[in-house]
């Protein structure tokens, strides 16, 4: 199977998840470039939506608030179901609601 075949078979977003430093962003950008797909990073999208950095969110509102916002952003990124590559934050899969959303809406790849 070549890259064109792979791209044609993708019918949903691909998410990359793993611990911090696993290479989600680097791998995601490379995959998106090879497949000519959009690349999104959920951490960057969270910061845009909140108007502050992730450390600032944690300091001001705490982890529970952050995880709730993270789930909303991931839900938005997966809403149109078009193929794209999405790098998730290291703790995104800690939420059972986010896990369920990802299992329904995306092809998920764990990088270790």
What are these regions (language model features)?
Residues 38-103:
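ATP-dependent small-molecule kinase phosphotransfer cores
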Residues 25:
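Walker A/P-loop
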Residues 19:
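P-loop (Walker A) phosphate-binding loop of NTP-binding proteins
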Residues 16:
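Hydrophobic anchor at the beta1->P-loop junction of P-loop NTPases
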Residues 22:
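Short, conserved catalytic or interaction motifs in soluble domains
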Residues 102-112:
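Conserved phosphate-donor/acceptor-positioning beta-strand/loop module used by diverse small-molecule
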Residues 1-12:
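Extreme N-terminal, non-catalytic leader segments
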